[in-house]
């Protein structure tokens, strides 16, 4: 049953709906971060089996990183992240964008903005709401869709993305404070798991009128790097998401509708 419908029925006094919620919660670990209805997100600690984590760690250790690798990765990450958002720029055009700072097309500007956002994160030690707002300004500079919904910090109106209706504007300050409290505070067994939870929550909240996808991917890689996994600076997360977009969006939907159990997205 859909999470939201079950939640509604339980609130209306449906005994069976309430029992199903309770039984589900017994199988999961509760997180400190809460959804728009005030219920905590949950996940299965066994979402990533020990052997899978060991295999991932082994592959990670085999990654060789140079400054050239990192620079190329930033350029390619910016490219693939913006392709997800509809940029039509081709891989062969990247040289003109980065060397000549070409911004003739909207997609070119999107890519250059995303590149600059990564560079901004690299020289900024703070990870808080002020940094997030500045990151959004860089990402959407000159290419902001839905600018009419831009508020002082976050979006000023409600938005619907596909089947997802983002939480009300009034909740954004509180929920984004939760986001950073969780990011800096809660101890999760593995950075991969915590990165997935943070990514899901940011996309779920959709705090800005535009640029949320690009920012969520930037923050995910940034979190992993600052968790001691520096070799992720040479990887291109957005390329993988772009190539498996159907599974990515299905995992997001499953986690939202399945009691806000983030396990499906962690496993993705």
Identify the function of each model-found stretch.
Residues 1-268:
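FIC/Doc superfamily catalytic core
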